[in-house]
UniProtKB/Swiss-Prot annotation:
It comes from Serratia marcescens. Belongs to the universal ribosomal protein uL10 family. InterPro entries: Ribosomal_uL10 (IPR001790), Ribosomal_uL10-like_sf (IPR043141), Ribosomal_uL10_bac_type (IPR047865), Ribosomal_uL10_CS_bac (IPR002363). This is Large ribosomal subunit protein uL10. One of its GO terms (molecular function) is rRNA binding.
Length: 86
């Protein structure tokens, strides 16, 4: 699904806000994970109070720029799941 500029800006703003208050971040390659397993993981994440989202790599590079998580920029390759904890 193609995102227009406003959608991209909204995603970057939302995830940037979460990243600002995050204590830690985890980046995971989601290739090979079944839909059922991903659904389980997301449910467990919600219950644990973590923010979990699949975001386009180019947008994630914008999100982490200028944050303590900037060192993660090179890890955004392929289908990437980002998790922030507070």
């Amino acid at each position: 699904m193609a995102l227009n500029l406003q959608d991209k800006q909204a995603i970057v703003a939302e995830v940037s806000e979460v990243a600002k208050g995050a204590l830690s971040a985890v980046v995971a390659d989601s290739r090979g994970v079944t839909v059922d397993k991903m659904t389980e993981l997301r449910k467990a994440g919600r219950e644990a109070g973590v923010y979990m989202r699949v975001v386009r790599n180019t947008l994630m590079r914008c999100v982490v720029e200028g944050t303590p998580f900037e060192c993660l920029k090179d890890t955004f390759v392929g289908p990437t799941l980002i998790v922030f904890s507070h």
